[in-house]
Amino acid sequence: MGREDRSGKRKSREQSRKRRVPELGYYYIVTDTDQTEKNYLEGLRNSIPEELKGKLVIKVSKSRTVDLVKTCKEGSSLYPQYCEPWVVFDRDQVKDFDGIIKNAEQNGIHAGWSNPCLEIWLYAYFGNMPYIQDSVSCCNRFATEYEKRTGQKYDKAEKDLYKKLCEVGNEESAIRIAQQKRKQCIENGLLIPSEMIPSTMIDELINEIRMKM
């Protein structure tokens, strides 16, 4: 049943839904981890100024890697007219990395991928995206840099990861670096995501949300 407005008249569910549409965007983001990506994205969500909460909404969900697109498609279908669907994941050891990205794009879902891992994007907050081929080496090198910059050990379960990166790093510079690295890959003929090292697309998600805050 609908709710009553101030005049006592009943409102339909459709009318109620229209009133709740976030005018600056509703971002439905599905990731395949319980730690780094999820904590980072929830930190981004928590950074939304109080006066914009309700107008700019970020919902982060978890799914198995193979079900990322399916889960995102199902969740975003609840708000098809204004939802911005994203899947966020690493190349890491994902077998069908390029296939997942292609599947997402074919379903109108943005793919915020990172190659070799999310830490290559986090590294950019410190002014650099070094050439590192595997995720283990990338995580270890980022952990060393993170400790040097913050004085704290890097922990994938760190809830304040986004906040700390913004405090000791430079997000605007990180976005520029990511754009430059992606451009370099393309200029070098590396057009397939699994071949684009180092590279990421998550900067596009961050930049889009930043512009609305």
Regions found by a protein language model. Give the residues of each.
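Short N-terminal edge-element motif at the start of the domain
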Residues: T65-P80
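Short amphipathic beta-strand starts and helix->beta connectors
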Residues: K11-Q15, V69-C72
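Catalytic nucleophile-elbow at a beta strand-turn-alpha helix junction centered on a G-D-S/GDSL motif
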Residues: Y26-K38
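Short glycine-centered, acidic/aromatic-flanked micro-motifs in structured strand/loop junctions
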Residues: T31, F89-R91
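C-terminal accessory helical subdomains adjacent to catalytic cores in phosphodiester-
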Residues: G2-R6, S12-L24, K38, E42-K59, ...
